[in-house]
């Protein structure tokens, strides 16, 4: 069975967690880091995923795609696109479906991949990291995404997981996942009729800021309000610092880092480190060697100067707090605790502003970097048939009202508000319509004027067929089960026609009726299910044929990555064998090879080395294996002789040690027997003297 996996899909880095019988663990990656860079790099033969991509980002800047969370499911025509493009060094393009893709040079040619594809590449790497660490099968995942993701973005994230070979059992809001982590592991939550504990969660990460208000009782969580600022995060601080130094270096060193993508990236990376240093210190130096044109730059920044640079951002700190409280219909005084998560909340001026907004001290009982992933792993475990977890129920909140629209046939109305703003989900509503034939239904946001710019009004559309009107009737009642599922997707779960039939129903006997009285019946009308209708959904999810094609493509790329890695490993093994064997041939192995063998093998090693740095520099896995086996055919014979002699020496040494131990033991036993004999003789002599004594008393 699959190990429950929670993925905190972060913009700068992602955190991976798994649920096991002993609890929830964070999974470390191949370099033992507890988070993995969320990016994908493209090279001449293979991709560089996560840590590998980060290591090559500066040298491969135009072919490395980061900020994945920001472009998944986003339309190229969306008003956010221009803002997002500022943070990309790779070229963003418009795909055929209107979504965003990235153009990179890969495998020697220009190629375009959709944002969903690239996110899937990263998620596949995350899956591999978990499988390598746990040595288990991983398919089920709870995917933590921003609360500001619309339906299209949530579907795109789920599709990315599917392309990566994962089954997204739930797409959950990231701050809600952190709240679940809080609720599951807190042992002092109120119970029964006690007043619920109200906790505000403030998450400021790399690219966005979310505030959610949760109401807790033991085993229960209800999100009361959520608000956010999509363009307020650590990267905005980094960019402000970078722009400050760009202007300074332009005047001081006569260089413009804005004209050089690599230089700009290096300064922004250094700016991120400087920001972290200034969270603990009031001032810090800023130095980069050969940033561009062989120019070394040097400067410094104080915490006070940083706060001046980000003053426009700081003015927006309280807005999400105010909106979340308003949606929850609460005041700051109603909040019991304020939990902060996300790396950017470590900045002192932000902590002070958040504390002032709630007029209370901040709590850090949650791990700021790992709470979301742990909550997601627990949520995935809830869906596991094999892992038993403590009962915990949680509900999220509809930010916008959703109505369902239908073809007007019999009814006066052609739509109904089904899921009001502020209502909880998952939620199900059953409605009845009178239909004259097949029809379509559409889910739309009720008040499009309140939606963020660029957000589509339409959510989904369904074609409902198989409607049969009884002879002599003008319409037939159709029942529809409308649902907002646990992932926040709006669906029609089922649809069927109903009919009224007359049945006989027994009348309960009177209290004074005799026991042997004949039962009496009455005729009643009952509504029963008649025909199940067919539903064809048109959502933002990828069509099955397209999804399968992308899955196949990802599997091919993953196989190519694996082949390249194995080929490089074989090449390194061959190279190491050449150098190691050459060194040992004149030393340890010298006595175990004839002069003829030495000459022959040295010649083979020289030719292999020459081949490695010439035509074999970029060869195939099979050729590296063949070259290795050719050398090993003689080298391993000599090594075998050496190992046999070494084993003989070890056996001789072991025999000598055992003989010495036996001799030592025999000597000890002999000494022990001699001591015992002497003691017996001494005792006998003593007893003899005692027999000759005369008692004068």
Swiss-Prot record:
Record's subcellular location: Cytoplasm
Bias kind Basic and acidic residues: ranges: 675-691
Low complexity bias (residue ranges): 664-674
Lineage summary: Eukaryota, Fungi, Dikarya, Ascomycota, Saccharomycotina
InterPro entries named among the record's database cross-references: ATPase_NBD (IPR043129), HSP70_C_sf (IPR029048), HSP70_peptide-bd_sf (IPR029047), Hsp_70_fam (IPR013126)
Main subcellular location of this protein, as a coarse class: cytoplasm
Keywords: ATP-binding, Chaperone, Cytoplasm, Nucleotide-binding, Stress response
Entry GO terms, CC: cytosol; nucleus
Native source organism of the sequence: Eremothecium gossypii (strain ATCC 10895 / CBS 109.51 / FGSC 9923 / NRRL Y-1056)
BP term (GO), one: protein folding
Name of the gene encoding the protein in the UniProt record: SSE1
Domain of life: Eukaryota
Stated family: Belongs to the heat shock protein 70 family.
Protein name: Heat shock protein homolog SSE1
Record has Transmembrane helix as a keyword: no
SUPFAM superfamilies xref list: Actin-like ATPase domain, Heat shock protein 70kD (HSP70), C-terminal subdomain, Heat shock protein 70kD (HSP70), peptide-binding domain
UniProt GO MF annotations: adenyl-nucleotide exchange factor activity; ATP binding; ATP-dependent protein folding chaperone; peptide binding
Sequence segments annotated as region (Disordered): 664-697
Tagged with keyword Transferase: no
PANTHER family tied to this protein: HSC70CB, ISOFORM G, HSC70CB, ISOFORM G-RELATED
